[in-house]
Amino acid sequence: MATWMEGKYVARGQFTGECIAVLTSGGDAQGMNAAVRAVVRMGIYCGCRVFFIREGYQGLVDGGQNIQEASWADVSGILQLGGTKIGSARCMDFRERYGRLKAAENLVKNQITNLVVIGGDGSLTGANLFRAEWSSLLEELVTSNKISAESAKQFHRLNIVGLVGSIDNDFCGTDMTIGADSALHRIIEATDAISTTAHSHQRCFILEVMGRHCGYLALVASMACEADWVFIPEMPPTDDWREKLCHKLRMNREHGQRVNIIMVAEGAIDRACKPITCEIVKNLIVSELQLDTRITVLGHVQRGGSPSAFDRILGSRMGAEAVLALMDADRDPNLPSCVISLDGNQAVRVPLVKCVDRTRQVAEAMKACDFDHAVELRGTSFMNNLATYIKLSKIEQPRQSVMSSENNLRIGIVNVGAPACGINAVIRGFTRLGITKGYKVIGIHEGFSGLVKGDASEIQWADVRGWVGMGGSMLGTRRDTPNGLGIDKVAAKFKELKLSGLLIIGGFEAYECMIELVEGREKYPELCIPMAMVPATISNNVPGTDFSLGCDTALNEITSVLDKIKQSALGTKRRVFVVETMGGYCGYLATMSALAGGADAAYIFEEPFTIDDLREDVVHLRAKIDDNVKRGLVLRADMLINTITSEFIHQLYAQEGQGIFDCRCNVLGHMQQGDRPSPFDRSLGTKFASKAIDWLDEQINANIVQILQSIHQTFMLYINWYCTSSDNLFKYSLELREHTDFVHRLPKEEWWLSLRPLMRIMAKHDSLYESESIMAGTDRK
């Protein structure tokens, strides 16, 4: 299970009298508004005065009306908006000392010594320099009679915390920057749309994506849309790339592919550090292959639109932690300025100086054409993505004679449980990598019930073309388990199909199937083959993993609907919505969508509540709407106490809110499973497939004799991966049983429960918040 460091509890009004300012600088990024909102509301919750600095560093230099005190209501209704409410600008004045001198004067005059800077590497580098010069700036201001000596003494220390807001994801020290996930959404939305017209005309499309000198967006987008080729700065192609590119496109066309997609990062270069542009690639393809080729430059579309659920939650978490980091620094002068970063799934504080220095080293390595070192400096998350892409880019459809050889070992793949977006990405990646390794991949249709009926067939290379972007399960899925169907029948089919390994994709039912198959090995030797499982369920209730495939897509679907529901209340005003989400007994979807959607409450099984709690929330909403807030939003997970249904909550709110607000109820239902997978689910599914086939191949090769002779042997059985940035780790299924609540189909420990107080605080409730961040080094990325 995930291990979390304990932080400090923070109560309302704990830091009364402190002043905090927040600014957004440089290029805007979706999710900045979520961070600004969290800084303001957590600051006010802690008793601080919070100030907006409008127009970034330019507003800090100009002062005056650009520095304004913020209220709770000032950040209401901005969570779902792209860009930044307080404006951003690239400020040349701040690059010079005279500009920083004016900025220091304006901060002192407003009695501000705590600053949250939200921006990219340039903005945070400027913040680092500003803090380093603070003492000398104050001395100069005293000498020129701009401030008094008493003021200089009173405000002698400047505390700065950075939040990385950048779609490029190019800042060292954090796995994800605010805005990168939303930018991926825009890229994939555009690519999916382009693919349909490209298919009609058999065209090749070359897409230029942003990212400056970082290839993250192009790299992940290429995996998420089955691109034929990608050009990124960190991995310049070999000198013969023209021949290889043309060969790959030619082969794909010969095998029936009607569409070719090529991703080009705007900073793409060759081994001689010369730019590779879309025009160069287009001219090559047209001259050598005579393909109808078009260029699409996505441009600032990637910065726009509503933030993804991930960026809203990330911005909220980082903004809240930034306030607490500032308060800690104010009480301990030895603490360095830090950046609130994401390490795997945990917020950490990384020294700002080290982050800036490491980011500078990346630029130097790229300039020196030391690409391997640049990739290493980018961090483990980037390296894992790159390794997966390289593995997939090297494979091509084998000759038919190799694919049809009778000597090929057979690996089965089956789906169990409800459909979830991302499943098809696993099947595609697993199938093609398996075929390349010499296996026959046997697709078992309609779960284990299909297996018992003999509904299984070999999956061919071309069968899975285009599957990464498809929702649901193309193989079909059922909830039946081996014991329910008769494990003797399942074992007989294993023997009949001559399976040497098995991959199960699914949710809690798949987890139960794995355990039943392990327990059946003692009686049925046919089950003694390596098996692995990929967690895939929107409920995110599989023990041993932080994220299951499909839950990110579901979160985005729910968040999008919540935005529309809240929008409807703007016209009617004074309305509270009760919304029921899926998830079974697991409250993940209800809690995280409440945080991403700005809900006032979320009722879940894991956190018991009573009628009195409901009444308190009604009182809270009455006061909120009396205070000129137009709407309220309450979420409920679908499996709670039987008597407290969504309709009961709706009637209670409607009755208690009479004269103040009216109430409506919405049950979202199966639309939460989504249409097309999110970029996260597509890329995660592809990486899961790569890890699964590698492990199964290793186990099969290590035990090849025993498998062929059907010797009774219990191989080590792994269940799934705890998804971190540093690696994808396997877990033993039987070890996980003690961490499982089988009655309610839940893990006994759930990491996201620690975020519930933050959700309540953002909605103006009293709640005891626990800081989740710890101090860490840049080597975590």
Swiss-Prot record:
Top enzyme category: transferase
Region (N-terminal catalytic PFK domain 1): 1-394
InterPro entries documented for this protein: 6-Pfructokinase_euk, ATP_PFK, Phosphofructokinase_CS, Phosphofructokinase_dom, PKF_sf
Activity at various pH: Optimum pH is 7.5-9.0.
Stretch list, region C-terminal regulatory PFK domain 2: 410-781
Cofactor: Mg(2+)
Residues of the active site: D168 (proton acceptor)
Purpose: Catalyzes the phosphorylation of D-fructose 6-phosphate to fructose 1,6-bisphosphate by ATP, the first committing step of glycolysis.
UniProt name for this protein: ATP-dependent 6-phosphofructokinase
